[in-house]
Design a protein with these regions (language model features):
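Short hydrophobic alpha-helical membrane-embedded segments
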Residues: 27-34, 51-58, 78-79, 204-208, ...
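Membrane-embedded helical hairpins/re-entrant loop segments and their flanking transmembrane helices
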Residues: 12-25, 33, 37-71, 276-358
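Membrane-helix interface "capping/anchor" motifs
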Residues: 66-77, 220-226, 352-357, 400-408
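Alpha-helical transmembrane segments of multipass membrane proteins
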Residues: 38-41, 61-69, 88, 114-115, ...
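Core transmembrane helix bundle of multi-pass membrane transport proteins
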Residues: 2-29, 90-312, 377-432
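Helix-loop-helix junctions within the multi-pass membrane cores of secondary transporters/permeases
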Residues: 12, 76, 103-121, 125-129, ...
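The feature marks cytosolic C-terminal regulatory regions of anion transporters and related permeases
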Residues: 396-554
């Protein structure tokens, strides 16, 4: 039974009754996407058994669906967290030991996520400059591609050990964090020709064909093939080739999971919190990474999916963050990689016709069913096929289109973007984002922003008449003082004619302009009007409507 296309779908059990077939179908299609991706993400994250990536997606679907503040997002493990989780596992020694200790970081970070939501910190994503965030995501994409290339080539795991571990600290028996800057990306790149020379011919063929399929499908814009998830075709072709080449005789070539019931009955709780006392500095560092980057990526997805929602429903970001934190606490205790609201599966969910949160629930149920009855099929999937899917995910984060977009915004944003990428890859994500933030502050000051305006919004609301409001901003409108301006705007009475007057601002940066246009869309969707005014002498630093603008008088 389906609803009228103009009627907003109901939530809860009523929503399931109204949209059962649509959500069931979408949930099944997303399941076909999620299964191979969840396996690949878990493996790439350093989790010994990839089944735990699927367990994360199951919890995200079956449990978090009903805790979530968003209706159409799909919760599950994310490629964007691969460098962080794999880095965390390696920092604690790698293998089983590193996994158990990394789970301690995941659980503590998850509790922090819950607190973020309860303290209504869902808006903190607005504080970060857009160029720095996009730089971080592009850097993550590049890291994913680099780390998956050896697997695509079928390189045996023992040739990768030196590229993934640092010098062991005799005091702890763990890799010295000082030797592991940038998750060893620089060292991995230097050693790549030597590493790839150990390729396996049959696995390389499977990997390359898988890569051609997943990239080729991205160019299909319509027709029957567009409706088929590319990962499904990749897995079918890869399994067929794997059987033909008899790669089951090649060590480490195929996914190995074991039976779900056997794994969970043997050891249901896998977390180890001893890292808190043995190496507290390393523990705290990775907790911060997981909590901040995971929360940020999830919040950005929620915002993006709200824009794609056919009914323009608004999510509760704080509730969603709390739900994700609760889900991650459970997955961390059991052994899974952390989940976020994942953008690729969520946008596909909308494309497949999902109407309510039940699509996420059904996708989780199908995943659970697969682990109960389809393990023999899962265990003939070649790892190079999963590597191809992850390389494509990395490419989406760091595509040439992203670089062109940042250049279109202006040289200031492009510089911040590039510097953030370099520092994230050479050092770590937190240092990279912090560098991007500081660089944007410096560029804003160089453009004429006053230091006293960096963190203080100077905005007043004037009521012209009963139906007309003016928000007059003086000083500078910057990412670093935007939350104060946003607070005044969201508190305005709905349904009025609002003018955001930026004519007296010396500097209006890109992040603020972009956020104001989003607020404008939200306000007008609720029946009001909003106009954003800037001075005729404001000069844009780029070619976009939201490029940074600087007031040039005389």
């Amino acid at each position: 039974m389906s609803t009228n296309s103009n009627q907003i779908p109901k939530d809860g059990l009523e929503g399931m009754k109204q949209n059962f077939l649509a959500d069931l179908q979408s949930g099944f299609m997303v399941f076909l996407l999620a299964l191979p991706l969840s396996l690949g993400i878990a493996k790439a994250s350093g989790i010994p058994n990839p089944i735990f990536g699927v367990i994360t997606a199951i919890i995200g679907g079956i449990i978090v669906s009903f805790l979530s503040g968003s209706r159409l997002t799909i919760k599950g493990p994310a490629a964007g967290l691969i460098p962080i989780i794999s880095g965390c596992v390696v920092a604690f020694g790698g293998g089983e030991q590193g996994w158990h200790l990394a789970l301690g970081c995941i659980v503590v970070a998850s509790v922090i996520q819950v607190l973020f939501g309860l303290l209504k910190m869902g808006n903190f994503a607005d504080f970060f400059p857009g160029a720095a965030i996009h730089g971080m995501l592009a850097s993550i994409g590049i890291m994913i591609i680099i780390k998956q290339l050896p697997i695509l080539f079928g390189v045996a795991g023992n040739f990768l050990k030196d590229a993934h571990t640092g010098v062991v600290d005799p005091a702890t028996g763990l890799p010295d964090p000082k030797t592991m800057k940038g998750y060893d990306i620089v060292g991995l790149v230097k050693n790549m020709p030597s590493i790839l020379s150990h390729y396996d011919q049959h696995l390389l063929i499977i990997g390359v064909i898988s890569l051609v399929i997943v990239f080729g499908f991205s160019f299909i814009k319509s027709g029957f093939l567009k409706k088929i998830p590319a990962p499904l075709i990749v897995i079918i072709v890869a399994i067929t080739l794997g059987i033909s080449f008899m790669v089951k005789d090649t060590p480490g070539a195929l996914v190995k999971t074991g039976r779900l019931t056997d794994i969970l009955s043997t050891q249901f709780i896998n977390v180890d919190f001893s890292g808190i006392s043995s190496i507290p500095g390393v523990f705290i560092k990775w907790v911060i990474f997981i909590a901040l980057v995971g929360s940020l990526e999830s919040l950005l997805t929620v915002k993006a999916i709200d824009g794609l929602d056919p009914w323009k429903r608004k999510s509760n970001a704080n509730k969603d963050l709390t739900g994700v934190g609760i889900g991650n606490t459970l997955t961390g205790l059991i052994g899974g990689s952390p989940m976020i609201a994942e953008v690729v599966r969520s946008s596909a969910n909308i494309g497949f016709g999902a109407k309510t949160r039940w699509a996420n629930f059904f996708h989780g149920m199908f995943l659970l069913l697969a682990l109960l009855v389809a393990v023999p099929i899962i265990e003939v999937i070649p790892y190079p096929a999963l590597a191809a899917l992850l390389i494509f995910a990395g490419y989406r984060l760091a595509s040439p289109k992203e670089f062109r977009h940042m250049l279109h915004l202006g040289m200031d944003q492009f510089i911040i973007f590039i510097v953030t990428i370099i520092v994230c890859a050479a050092d770590d994500l937190l240092v990279g984002v912090a560098t991007g933030i500081v660089l944007e502050l410096i560029l804003n000051i160089v453009s004429g922003a006053k230091i006293g305006n960096l963190f203080k919004s100077r905005a007043v609301v004037e009521e012209k008449n009963s139906n007309q409001l003016v928000v007059r901003v003086t000083g500078d409108a910057l990412f670093s003082n935007y939350l104060g301006l946003k607070k005044k705007i969201v508190e305005l009475q709905k349904g009025k004619n609002v003018t955001i007057d930026l004519a007296q601002c010396k500097v209006i940066d890109h992040t603020t302009l972009n956020s104001l246009h989003e607020l404008q869309h939200d306000y007008e969707s609720e029946g009001g009007t909003m106009i954003i005014l800037n001075h005729e002498h404001h000069v844009a630093k780029g070619k976009s409507e939201t490029s940074t603008k600087v007031l040039k008088l005389g």
